[in-house]
């Protein structure tokens, strides 16, 4: 343990074996009904790591049936004390902590994450998420209501039922636990589809779920592709709720499928094009580093990425110059290699999309300050890229890039920058840097975003609700608000002979 309280990095695993590659239903491993498998790759080397069973509609049907059986009235899960649900989540956290090195190595090999970030940040967040949600299990309470007349009225917060959960590839394990932990804390059962690019860590945790003692059918995991397994979850008539993290385009399809099937409840955490405003009175040194990390963390593959950086005119030129200097310090390479500070993009599709957007920035007149192309001869690496003189109409200023591409735009006045910051279909996150408290509060109230950070960015914790405005999604995850998404409120009124105050 370091003096700061963070764990020291362990010796890397050199012989990691991927043991768990099947479909997990009823606490057992299954082959896919179709017999199909799909390959899983290391994006840093383009080498195949293993093959995973490819679930589709028939496998989803089996998983939903298991989840429904586990949710029946009188089942071990439904009759379990809420405090016992919490104990199981605490136990799962302990097991994840035991296997922290294995899981962090998987996230790095399969997801292209820097090992240090996977071990310290992602796995650290996983443990905090599980323990936070475990503590809530016996604190999800209803109320008594003083209704008129001789009646006794109270509310119950009941679990929604069978929840379908569709995961992204950028934070595979953290998003898996963000989804299942609040759902299980509230007493739901789940059917989870990991992203096809990054299914391995969720499948490993499936074994820990069984080891922790969760009853069969409570957690089911069906790896597969979005148009097959994901679509089957979204349209399934016996799934009561679906939660999805991913692109806005897919989020629309999921909401449409939910509406056309059984009007299942939907929680969506979608894309963003988040503005970050740096005023001339900001602490420049800190603002430079924070705005840099706000974009380049995990190769820019974060929904929170501050991908529209607005800098006040009087400090613009210096800010651009120093931002370029910072971007040029990166060391690209295999994310398991000590000293490497930038890994690969997740796959060829994302790699090509990012390079296309970089080319559009060049063609539309933005000034390329550094980077602007691929790196190396294998793996999906892209040079850290900075554009200046970016106008609001350019594609790189409007579209979510999801890559290591920073756009720095100039502004003159407070009213102007607020209007420009809000001129987007997205509304996920926003930030500002200023020493002026009045300005900070004014901007925070005016920005149309689910989270606004002041003099910091990307500060995410289990205690805080997370979600977006506009086309960045519906509902909230984590914090007390996140549990509301996994309960139904029932009003119970009982006739009594006499009511007394």
UniProtKB/Swiss-Prot annotation:
Its main location: cytoplasm. CDD domains: ALDH_F1AB_F2_RALDH1 (cd07141). The modification N-acetylserine is found at residue 2. PROSITE patterns: ALDEHYDE_DEHYDR_CYS, ALDEHYDE_DEHYDR_GLU. GO terms for molecular function: 3-deoxyglucosone dehydrogenase activity; acetaldehyde dehydrogenase (NAD+) activity; aldehyde dehydrogenase (NAD+) activity; aminobutyraldehyde dehydrogenase (NAD+) activity; benzaldehyde dehydrogenase (NAD+) activity; NAD binding; retinal dehydrogenase activity. SUPFAM superfamilies: ALDH-like (SSF53720). The record marks 170 as: Transition state stabilizer. Keywords: Acetylation, Cell projection, Cytoplasm, Lipid metabolism, NAD, Oxidoreductase, Phosphoprotein. The N-terminus is blocked most probably by acetylation. Its EC number is 1.2.1.19, 1.2.1.28, 1.2.1.3, 1.2.1.36. It comes from the Eukaryota. Pathway: Cofactor metabolism; retinol metabolism. InterPro entries: Ald_DH/histidinol_DH (IPR016161), Ald_DH_C (IPR016163), Ald_DH_CS_CYS (IPR016160), Ald_DH_CS_GLU (IPR029510), Ald_DH_N (IPR016162), Aldehyde_DH_dom (IPR015590). One of its GO terms (biological process) is maintenance of lens transparency. The modification Phosphoserine is found at residue 413. It catalyses: an aldehyde + NAD(+) + H2O = a carboxylate + NADH + 2 H(+); all-trans-retinal + NAD(+) + H2O = all-trans-retinoate + NADH + 2 H(+); 9-cis-retinal + NAD(+) + H2O = 9-cis-retinoate + NADH + 2 H(+); 11-cis-retinal + NAD(+) + H2O = 11-cis-retinoate + NADH + 2 H(+). The modification Phosphothreonine is found at residue 337. Belongs to the aldehyde dehydrogenase family. Cytosolic dehydrogenase that catalyzes the irreversible oxidation of a wide range of aldehydes to their corresponding carboxylic acid. Functions downstream of retinol dehydrogenases and catalyzes the oxidation of retinaldehyde into retinoic acid, the second step in the oxidation of retinol/vitamin A into retinoic acid. This pathway is crucial to control the levels of retinol and retinoic acid, two important molecules which excess can be teratogenic and cytotoxic. This is Aldehyde dehydrogenase 1A1. The lineage of its organism: Eukaryota, Metazoa, Chordata, Craniata, Vertebrata.
């Amino acid at each position: 343990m370091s003096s700061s309280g963070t764990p020291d990095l362990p010796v890397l695993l050199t012989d990691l074996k991927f043991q768990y590659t099947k479909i997990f239903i009823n606490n057992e491993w299954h082959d896919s009904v179709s017999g199909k498998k799909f390959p899983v790759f290391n994006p840093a080397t383009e080498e195949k790591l293993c093959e995973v069973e490819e679930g589709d509609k028939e496998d989803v049907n089996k998983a939903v049936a298991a989840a429904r059986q586990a949710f029946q009235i009188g089942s071990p899960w439904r009759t379990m004390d809420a405090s016992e649900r919490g104990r199981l989540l605490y136990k799962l956290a302990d097991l994840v902590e035991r296997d922290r090195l294995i899981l962090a190595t998987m996230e790095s090999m399969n997801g292209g994450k820097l090992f240090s970030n996977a071990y310290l940040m992602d796995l650290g967040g996983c443990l905090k998420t599980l323990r936070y949600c475990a503590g809530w299990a016996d604190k999800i309470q209803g109320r008594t209501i003083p209704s008129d007349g001789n009646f006794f009225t109270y509310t119950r917060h009941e679990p929604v039922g069978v929840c379908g959960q569709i995961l992204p590839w950028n934070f595979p394990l953290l998003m898996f636990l963000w989804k299942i932990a609040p759902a299980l804390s509230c007493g739901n059962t789940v059917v989870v589809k990991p992203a096809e690019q990054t299914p391995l860590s969720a499948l490993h945790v499936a074994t820990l779920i069984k080891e922790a003692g969760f009853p069969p059918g409570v957690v089911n995991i069906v790896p597969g592709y979005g148009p097959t397994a994901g679509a089957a979850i979204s349209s399934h008539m016996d799934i009561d709720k679906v939660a999805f993290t991913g692109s806005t385009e897919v989020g629309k399809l999921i909401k449409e499928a939910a509406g056309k099937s059984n009007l299942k409840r939907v929680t969506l955490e979608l894309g963003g094009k988040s503005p970050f405003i740096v005023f001339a009175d900001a602490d420049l040194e800190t603002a430079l580093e924070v705005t840099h990390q706000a974009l380049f963390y995990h190769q820019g593959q974060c929904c929170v990425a501050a991908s529209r950086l607005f800098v006040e005119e009087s400090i613009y030129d210096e800010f651009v110059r120093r931002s370029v200097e910072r971007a040029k310090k990166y060391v690209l390479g295999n994310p398991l290699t000590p000293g490497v500070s930038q890994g690969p993009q997740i796959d060829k599709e994302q790699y090509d999309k990012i390079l296309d957007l970089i080319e559009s920035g060049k063609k539309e007149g933005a000034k390329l300050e550094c980077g602007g192309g691929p790196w190396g001869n294998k793996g999906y690496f892209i040079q850290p890229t900075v554009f200046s003189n970016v106008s609001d109409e350019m594609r790189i200023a409007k579209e979510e890039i999801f890559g290591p591409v920073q756009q720095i735009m100039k502004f003159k006045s407070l009213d102007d920058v607020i209007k420009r910051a809000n001129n987007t279909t997205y509304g996920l996150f926003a930030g500002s840097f200023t020493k002026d408290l009045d300005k900070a509060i004014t901007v925070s109230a005016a920005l149309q975003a689910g989270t606004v950070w002041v003099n910091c960015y990307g500060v995410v914790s289990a205690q805080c609700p997370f979600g977006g405005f506009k086309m960045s999604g519906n509902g909230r995850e984590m914090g007390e608000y996140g549990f509301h998404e996994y309960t139904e409120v029932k009003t119970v009124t009982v006739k009594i002979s006499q009511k007394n105050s």
